Structures are given as C-alpha cells and as structure tokens.
Amino acid sequence: MILRNTYKGVHSNQIGFPGGKIEKKDTSLFDTALRECEEEIGVVKNDIIKVRKLSPVYIPPSNYNVHPFVGYIDYEPNFLLDSKEVSKIIKPSFETLLNLKITKSKVIVKDDEQLVPSFIIDDHVVWGATAIMIHEFNLLFKHVLNS
C-alpha cells in the first residue's frame, strides 16, 4: 500500500495502491496496473506474477472505475518511490491484513460528511475503494484456506 502525497486532488494524502489511467501503450488493464506499479513504487513490472483480478470498484469523487488485480513477486523489492505521487510505502504483515476488523469512519468527500467502512492499519485509516479491495482479498483468501 502507499500513502499518496498531498496535492490538489480528491485522493490527496490517502492510503491506496499504485494505479492510474490506461494509456495507449497499455495492452490490457493488467498491463496498466503493472506499468503504474513500476512508475509509482519501482517494482519491475515483468517480475510481477498475476494471481487474479478483483471486482471493479467505482470511485465517485474521481468518477473512475478501478480494476484491481492481485499479484506477487518472489523477492523483497527495492522500492523506488515517485516522489510526485507517493509519500511512503506501508507494508502491513500478511497476518495483519487477514485479521482486520471493519470499523466505520466519518470522512469528508466533496464537502459532504459520509460514514464509510474502514480499517486501521499501522496507525493509518484505510477506507473507501482501498478498504473494499482489501476486504474482497480477505474473503477470497479465507475461502481458499477453508477449501
């Protein structure tokens, strides 16, 4: 996960995952995800092994449909952060991710206070689309463990 830099935008200073808009050179949505991962945090895109696609998530403040993917690399990466976009990397343990408890947080979105599902991870509030993606990952992983 990443902490986005502070900037004039709807995702300023929020916890999320690398990502962005599809570009002409991208051959697929997964290729977009790989490119963004390499650009934002320096993980070599050709080293990432795709596990599966998660459910698309609509993000009202930015009016985007996000198409998340789960992938992994088989080594500890040397992160190279894009300082324009990423403030820091947040690396919770796998155990932490699998044992999250959903809480509710009040957040301000476009001058409107909303109650949204969230998690606390390493003293950071993770909410919105990021929380939805993590929750789906947890459900899928626990299903595999119980199969």
Each model region followed by its residue ranges:
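N-terminal strand-loop-strand
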Residues: 1-17
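A conserved hydrophobic position in a structured secondary element of the catalytic/binding core
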Residues: 17, 92, 129
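Unchanged
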Residues: 7, 22-121, 125-126, 135, ...
